[in-house]
């Protein structure tokens, strides 16, 4: 189990700290440190659970950055730098931090929200509304046609980078319906034989990505104006630049390539 969620830390276990300074996360030797920066004032300290045998804590730096070993990195570069085993811990901390910062007042009556002692949610002492960390489900689909994969790029992607199709689930919509809708809207293609692959919590800012592989079922590629800059079919031995290795898109594309090669063997 990646996370255990007791109410109190286990005193016999070591610690891991996610200390933020604005949009920056503090790392030591490219890892989440075992203790916060020495001699620094912290705010928002919170126990987030047990992850990989360590008590996980969240805090924000108050004042200037400490002049000591380590570096402050934006979240994406920090996730790339740290061991894969710690990525999920940092993602949890980033998502909960965003929730704590954005849910300070009741959206119903504007009363300051109270922190719950036994859960991560916050409640309104005036009207009784309860707020929990937001999770936004989104699907990702990799469309296969023989040994070719349909990859696309959005205008905000790094130059030369392509990825699988993705989009948020609409209210009242199933994941499967979202896959069919997004592939049609984004590239004008129909799909069939959907297969669930895996999922990933993605803290930009609070997505839960659910990845699928689907087979091509017709249609000519027609990139959606304003959303898709380019799209095309790519042979698995001639892929363009791909998303960073920690992303579910990278894992999904590599997984599909491996499956195709296994079938060809």
From Swiss-Prot:
Stored InterPro entries: NADH_PPase-like_N (IPR015375), NudC-like_C (IPR049734), NUDIX_hydrolase-like_dom_sf (IPR015797), NUDIX_hydrolase_CS (IPR020084), NUDIX_hydrolase_dom (IPR000086), RNA_Hydrolase_NudC (IPR022925), Znr_NADH_PPase (IPR015376)
Enzyme class, spelled out: hydrolase
Cofactor stoichiometry and binding remark: Divalent metal cations. Mg(2+) or Mn(2+).
Record: residues binding a divalent metal cation 3: 182, 186, 227
Presence of keyword Manganese: yes
Binding site for substrate: 76, 132, 200-207, 249
Residues that, per the record, bind a divalent metal cation 1: 166, 186, 227
GO MF entries: magnesium ion binding; manganese ion binding; NAD+ diphosphatase activity; NADH pyrophosphatase activity; RNA NAD-cap (NMN-forming) hydrolase activity; zinc ion binding
Annotated EC: 3.6.1.-, 3.6.1.22
PROSITE patterns: NUDIX, NUDIX_BOX
Assembly and interaction partners: Homodimer.
Protein name (database record): NAD-capped RNA hydrolase NudC
Annotated source species: Chromobacterium violaceum (strain ATCC 12472 / DSM 30191 / JCM 1249 / CCUG 213 / NBRC 12614 / NCIMB 9131 / NCTC 9757 / MK)
Gene this chain is encoded by: nudC
């Amino acid at each position: 189990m990646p996370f255990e969620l007791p109410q109190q830390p286990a005193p016999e276990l070591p610690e891991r700290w996610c200390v933020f300074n604005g949009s920056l996360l503090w790392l030591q030797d490219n890892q989440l440190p075992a203790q916060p920066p020495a001699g620094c004032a912290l705010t928002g300290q919170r126990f987030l659970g047990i992850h990989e045998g360590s008590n996980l804590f969240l805090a924000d730096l108050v004042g200037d950055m400490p002049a000591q070993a380590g570096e402050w990195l934006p979240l994406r570069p920090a996730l790339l730098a740290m061991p894969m085993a710690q990525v999920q811990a940092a993602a949890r901390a980033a998502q909960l931090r965003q929730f704590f910062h954005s849910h300070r007042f009741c959206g119903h009556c504007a009363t300051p929200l109270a922190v719950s002692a036994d859960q991560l949610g916050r409640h309104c002492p005036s009207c009784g509304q309860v707020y929990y960390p937001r999770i936004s489900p989104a699907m990702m689909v990799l469309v296969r046609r023989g040994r070719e994969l349909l990859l696309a790029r959005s205008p905000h992607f790094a130059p030369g980078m392509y990825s699988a199709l993705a989009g948020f689930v609409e209210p009242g919509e199933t994941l499967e319906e979202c896959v069919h809708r997004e592939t049609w809207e984004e590239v004008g293609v129909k799909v069939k034989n959907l297969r669930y692959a895996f999922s990933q919590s993605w803290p930009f800012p609070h997505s839960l990505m659910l990845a699928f592989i689907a087979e091509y079922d017709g249609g000519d590629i027609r990139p959606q104006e304003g959303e898709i800059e380019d799209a095309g079919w790519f042979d698995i031995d001639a892929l363009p630049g791909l998303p960073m290795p920690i992303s579910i898109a990278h894992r999904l594309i590599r997984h599909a390539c491996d499956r195709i090669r296994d079938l060809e063997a």
